[in-house]
């Protein structure tokens, strides 16, 4: 006997469906429940905290089983998707009444973290991306798709660091990678990783899939034809989404090449340290996005976060945004636009569900409501003079044909689903209205029949009723059942009553039930036809949604600029960061004390600032606010300052704070040095670099050596605009030795054992450290502080004595060349590989070295 024949027919059907979906959970519909079996049941019981039971036996073994009610399935799906799991939904598609054996079932949809479109399963104000990654010869192809909007992009990071930064920027909910993918550490700690066959990433297969999706002969029109690695990833991605959605994807109409040269590059450490959309604790409070985002719509919020994570280098684009914000701010139009745009809502995701034909009746009701707001929006925008705002207003112009169609087709307050009807409005279809009238007319007929039968037979307890089991019936109390005429056929006996059926009632029942089912069938057909009528407008609707989202972002930034007293930055191509009275956009909102604004000046003659001052004095805040102001200027936003001139920046680097990376086995110092190495390798003269307390994780001399050498390299070899905060006061001598460097410090004032931080940036180096005073503020016992002061006095005395010529100790302040340049002989020797030399070549090399001495 074959193994499959050892199972019941129902389990054979389940196992066949499970074999088609081996790597995901299978929700198998049985009556009012979705059941899971075997390993799926064990896994689901743990993830969902539901009971694990058994269902009889199959092949001689008890079958593990778990289940969830069908009416509550969305909540369970949401939890599984949040955990990175995918689920195949298997429904009964056959008629139990006509089925021989198990009812026919099939998988009707696959819910995955990266492809969900249902509102209940999505974070409203965050993009929901699925991505694919491909690797070849140290370079990467990376494609992302937002199924809820149709936004499809690819990029080709040139290194692991750049790839890690892209993964952090996009935070995909689901990540596809080939079976032979080597740098798997990039995916460590991520949910939703999906291993795919290598052939799905083949270039020709990818091009075929993409051309088929876009209806094109080639990809030249998208400007991606030479992005070979990116196309390999994009091809796998589109095939996977087609397989899971099991329908066409008409809203995915283009593939864009995201060139890294077009945007300010932010590595993973910078995004983390600047707390752009996620704070260091993993939440969203006290982030730049939390301060800037007061958008009226979720799609506006999502667009703003994309702007924050991908600042633009193009000055023209940023000036257009700033011009638009200026007009909205000066005329206070943001207060008029906000309420109208809020009524339009999140039509971007509604359109995705429309394209996938998974939209529900209330989605189309909301789309209708959005269309009804467009005339008012057009009126509000009619007085605008800015060309960019005018172009957005044109794209968001009223669509009367779509609005009129939805007003005719959909009831004012439709039900949640089409299943039970009641969605299509009266007057939309004469055929539907006719069948509905027949079904609705049943009530009047029944009332008339009840009255006639009661009077004819003198039975005052006679009632006409209906239930789902027995259909229509005539009910008579037990006490009057003897009055029932002979043609009444008993249908059911109750404790205190009898129920009967008569030919007239049976005939009416057949007619009513037929009219209801006929009306429902017509309504479902009209519903599907409505999709066909709306889909030709999809491209135009998507353009409208994008325009409204951008209007929302711009009015939001205008409101923020007005409310928070931001200024318009002056944009220039020169390498300069000149800020007057700059403020940290987040800290000034959360602190109860008045925020101390500070200036900064970086230019071609002043490329690096050595920043000293006490811990808690504000060095890190000062550095971060500079980076955030520069970043805000590169998204086309006003900035928190009295005035600001911001040059074109290609990258922002931050080396601020560090902690052990236990998962990768890296110490704090190793993390710090890795980030430092990344900066020293990749920074350019147009980069903004923030370096905070380099070298503190090792011994004093090692730390000072590394800090000095890093600062020296940045100043002499790279020339990046750099803020270099340090607790090594020896580094304040660097501006005396190298050009284009300057010292600044944050001051503090001591009063006995207490200390007051001034938080004001002053020119010059700090006069002293305040470590013991800060330790006292932290609650270190006074006895310990006293002992520390005594030890400090001894060390300072030894240092003073050691500075005399007779001393053998090292005077660090005067020994700045801690890492001397290698001699000519050492350089020549280092370039020689003895394994590659013949005896003659070795002898010649020896003579050359001898001459150099």
Swiss-Prot record:
Which processes are annotated in GO (biological process)?
mismatch repair
Q: Which domain of life is it from?
A: Bacteria
**Protein keywords:** ATP-binding, DNA damage, DNA repair, DNA-binding, Nucleotide-binding
Alphabetical list of InterPro entries matching this protein: DNA_mismatch_repair_MutS, DNA_mismatch_repair_MutS-lik_N, DNA_mismatch_repair_MutS/MSH, DNA_mismatch_repair_MutS_C, DNA_mismatch_repair_MutS_clamp, DNA_mismatch_repair_MutS_core, DNA_mismatch_repair_MutS_N, DNA_mismatch_repair_MutS_sf
Q: Where does ATP bind?
A: 613-620
GO CC entries = cytosol
For this protein, the record's SMART domains field holds: MUTSac, MUTSd
GO molecular function list? ATP binding; ATP-dependent DNA damage sensor activity; damaged DNA binding; mismatched DNA binding
Does the keyword section mention Coiled coil?
no
Q: Does the keyword Cytoplasm apply?
A: no
- One of the Pfam families matching this protein, by short name: MutS_V
Q: What PANTHER family does the record point to?
A: DNA MISMATCH REPAIR PROTEIN MSH1, MITOCHONDRIAL (PTHR11361:SF34), DNA MISMATCH REPAIR PROTEIN MUTS FAMILY MEMBER (PTHR11361)
Function of the protein: This protein is involved in the repair of mismatches in DNA. It is possible that it carries out the mismatch recognition step. This protein has a weak ATPase activity.
Give the family, as the similarity comment puts it: Belongs to the DNA mismatch repair MutS family.
What protein does this entry describe? DNA mismatch repair protein MutS
Per the UniProt entry, what species is this protein from, by scientific name?
A: Vibrio vulnificus (strain CMCP6)
